[in-house]
């Protein structure tokens, strides 16, 4: 059963869901669920973890008072993994030069990378 609460297209396949931090350059740090599908990257923001609690409404879609960030796969230009002993991150760079960082803390980013690269 799919974990993502965001409505998926009929032909869209969920590849995985993980609870992560999500950092939007100059837009904040959020804690929530990252879902990777074969068509999109969907981030359900449960909590604004940044000092600046202003949400950039241009990126987010609201469904039933819940905030979702949706990035179509075709907008992603590059996927850049960064691994250190205490911090594992993936930077997604879009075709409009926005950077979105998936911060998975000390946990392995390999399953997320596999889903993103498939």
Tell me what each language-model feature is.
Residues 1-53, 62-63, 68-69, 100, ...:
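Anionic N-terminal interaction surfaces
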Residues 50-53, 87-89, 108-112:
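A short local loop/turn or secondary-structure capping micro-motif enriched for an aromatic residue
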Residues 41, 66-84:
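Phosphoinositide-dependent membrane-docking surfaces
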Residues 57-59:
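Short, compositionally biased
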């Amino acid at each position: 059963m799919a974990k993502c609460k965001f409505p998926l297209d009929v032909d869209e396949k969920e590849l995985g869901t993980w609870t992560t931090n999500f950092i939007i350059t100059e837009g904040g740090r959020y804690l929530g669920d990252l879902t990777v599908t074969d068509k999109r990257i969907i981030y359900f923001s449960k909590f604004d973890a940044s000092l600046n609690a202003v949400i950039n409404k241009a990126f987010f879609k609201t469904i039933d008072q819940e905030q979702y960030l949706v990035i179509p796969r075709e907008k992603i230009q590059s996927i850049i993994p960064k691994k250190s002993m205490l911090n594992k991150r993936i930077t997604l760079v879009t075709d409009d030069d926005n950077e979105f960082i998936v911060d998975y803390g000390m946990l392995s980013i390999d399953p997320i990378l596999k889903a993103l690269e498939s």
